C-alpha cells in the first residue's frame, strides 16, 4: 500500500510540473534562447519554485487516501519539490538560481505592476524571495547575493548591517515557533529562533575576521534604531565604561553561541549603549 501511495504521489507531482512547464516556457519567450546553458539548467531546476511563489497551484483532492497526512495538495507537492531542488543546488550557486527565479517571475508579470525602476523592483523581489525560501525550506540562503550587488552598490556599513539582520532579530528575541508543513517527515519541530540563530552564525562566519567588530557594531546600531527613542534619552553622551561592557557582553554571547572567533579587543565606534538581552539556550527562546 505504501509503495502504491508513493508511486501515486510521484505521478501526481510529475503531472503538476508538466502542466506548469508550458506556462513557464511561454512566459520567457525569446529571452530563454539568449540564456547560457547553465542558466537554462538552473531555470529548469527551479521551475517548482517559480510555480509555487506565483501560487500557480490548486488544491488536489485524493478521497481514496485514508489518513490526514496523505491528504496533500498540489501546492504542497510543488513546495516540497522547490525545497528539494534548492537543497541540491550548491550554496555558492543558490544566489544565482534565485536571481533567475526573480527574473522569470518579473517577466511573467504585467508591465503595469512595475511602475518603479526595474532594478528597484528586482532588488525588493530578491529580498522577499530570499526570506521566504529560507524560512519555507529551512535551508541556508546567503543574504548578500552577487546579483543584489549588481542591482545597486550599497555602502559597506549598510551591507554589513543587512547581512547581520538575523543576528539583530535573534538578539532581540523577535521570533516565534513555526510548524513543519510535512508532518510525516521525522524531524523535530524547529522554531524560528533556531532558524534565525543558524542564519546569524552562518552570516557571521562568512565575514572576514578583520570586519567582524564593525559588523557587531552595526548590529548594535540596528537594535538601537529599533528601540523607542525615550529609552535612549541620556545615552548619547559618552559613557565609555558602559559601552565597552555592553559590547564585550554582546561579543561574548555571539562568540559562544556561534563558536566562532571574534577579536577580544573590539573598540566601540560610537557613543551609544547596547540593550542587553539573554541569549537562547540550546536553540530555545
Curated annotation (Swiss-Prot):
Function field: Seed storage protein. Might be integrated via inter-chain disulfide bonds within the glutenin polymer.
Alphabetized UniProt keyword annotations: Disulfide bond, Seed storage protein, Signal, Storage protein
Family statement? Belongs to the prolamin family.
Q: Do the record's keywords include Cytoplasm?
A: no
Please state the span of the N-terminal signal peptide per the UniProt entry: 1-18
Briefly state the modifications made to the protein after translation: Contains disulfide bonds.
Question: Which CDD domains does this chain map to?
Answer: AAI_SS
> What would be an example GO MF term here?
nutrient reservoir activity
- Record protein name field: Avenin-like b2
Natural source organism: Triticum aestivum
